[in-house]
UniProtKB/Swiss-Prot annotation:
Nucleus in keyword set: yes
Xref: SMART domains: DSPc (SM00195), PTPc_motif (SM00404)
InterPro entries, A to Z: Dual-sp_phosphatase_cat-dom, DUSP12, Prot-tyrosine_phosphatase-like, Tyr_Pase_cat, Tyr_Pase_dom, TYR_PHOSPHATASE_DUAL_dom
One GO term (biological process): signaling
Stated name of the protein: Tyrosine-protein phosphatase yvh1
Catalytic activity: O-phospho-L-tyrosyl-[protein] + H2O = L-tyrosyl-[protein] + phosphate
Pfam families named among the record's database cross-references: DSPc
Cellular compartments annotated: Cytoplasm; Nucleus
Top class in the EC scheme: hydrolase
Active site positions: C131 (phosphocysteine intermediate)
Entry keyword Hydrolase: yes
Domain spans labelled Tyrosine-protein phosphatase: 45-187
């Protein structure tokens, strides 16, 4: 299997023009003009067989193939923000409304797309996965399928695809989500820390982009630490605030400057006792101990700089000076 260095993202400038082209199509049926808006090599219009009976192409190629029944494509998966309007029987077509953007949650579609691809291949049918240019959304969905099917990591899947379709370029947001998918062993469950913390960081992205608090926040129940874990307890009343399962890790920005690398905060995921304060809808505020009401920390949905100089977003912070970190014995 090819190593990580076998592929590198290309054509990053295409992503913004793809969004513009799909936006244009929402108000016009001028398909050719929309295609002309995106300048990419003609080679990306090729039909690429990634593994037996599994193909990737651009939208232009997909439209031509399904209209002529060329190559014998039986099932088509469309990953576009607009309806691709393909002449495909409904039961043989899956349209996932996905944008090629830095905020799009594509993880939520992996299970559905994996099942669609697996079903088609189980019937010895040919399945085509396409987006607008055939370099980002379609590649990400096929990579997720290959990762789960072959127990591959992200780089192995993308190297495999790149060997068969040169010039792939999943956007940075999609790459992060593929890596979370691998870290979660191809499962999406809020009990899994990598997935939970990825969702949490999306809250901060939302707050920065929209200048308001996210409307739906998932709260963890306060649970006692397991053997060997840390338990954070209010220094004044000993109330258990969190276990190390819900710590949000970050690395000091400048490890060579010791005076600034000592973190004075514990950053946490949302925990049930925070809910009354966070549901006030403020972008920032303070945390009081739910038992003794003494101040223990603060929060800033749009992020704050830790004393170690690292930026943390969102920031739900407990001051280390206000709690005791106790390691639970077995």
């Amino acid at each position: 299997m090819s190593n990580k260095s076998a592929w590198q993202p290309q054509f990053d400038e295409i992503h913004s023009s793809v969004q513009e082209a799909e936006g244009f199509l929402q108000s016009s049926n001028d398909v050719q003009k929309a295609i002309d808006e995106v300048h990419y090599p003609d080679s990306l219009n090729d039909l690429s067989e990634i593994s037996k009976n599994l193909y990737i192409s651009s939208w232009k190629t997909a439209s031509e193939l399904v209209s002529t029944s060329d190559k014998g494509i039986d099932y088509t998966l469309s990953a576009m923000s607009i309806n691709p309007n393909l002449s495909v029987p409904e039961q043989q077509h899956l349209w996932l409304q996905i944008e090629d953007s830095s905020s799009q949650n594509i993880l939520q579609y992996f299970e559905k797309s994996n099942k669609f691809i697996a079903f088609a291949l189980s019937k010895n049918a040919k399945v085509l996965v396409h987006c607008f240019a055939g370099i980002s959304r379609s590649v990400t969905l096929v990579a997720a399928y290959l990762m789960k099917e072959n127990n591959w990591n992200t780089e192995e899947a993308l190297s495999h695809i790149n060997e068969r379709r040169s010039g792939i370029s999943p956007n940075a947001n999609f790459l992060r989500q593929l890596r979370v998918y691998f870290e979660c062993n191809y499962q999406l469950d809020r009990s899994l820390r990598p997935y939970r913390q990825w969702l949490f960081r999306r809250y901060g992205d939302f707050a920065v982009l929209n200048t308001r608090v996210p409307s739906e926040v998932a709260y963890a129940e306060t649970v006692r630490a397991r053997a060997g874990q840390l338990e954070l307890r209010c220094k004044k009343c000993r109330f258990v605030l969190a276990s190390s399962d819900y710590l949000v890790s970050h690395e000091p920005k400048d490890e060579n400057n010791y005076s600034h690398t000592r973190c004075t905060h514990y950053f946490l995921e949302p925990i049930r006792w925070m809910q009354p304060e966070l549901e006030l809808g403020n972008l920032e505020g303070r945390f009081d101990c739910p038992k003794c009401n003494s101040k223990i920390g603060s929060y800033k949905w749009q992020g704050l700089q830790c004393s170690c100089l690292q930026w943390v977003c969102p920031a739900l912070s407990i001051l280390q000076s206000r709690v005791d970190a106790v390691r639970k014995l077995g």
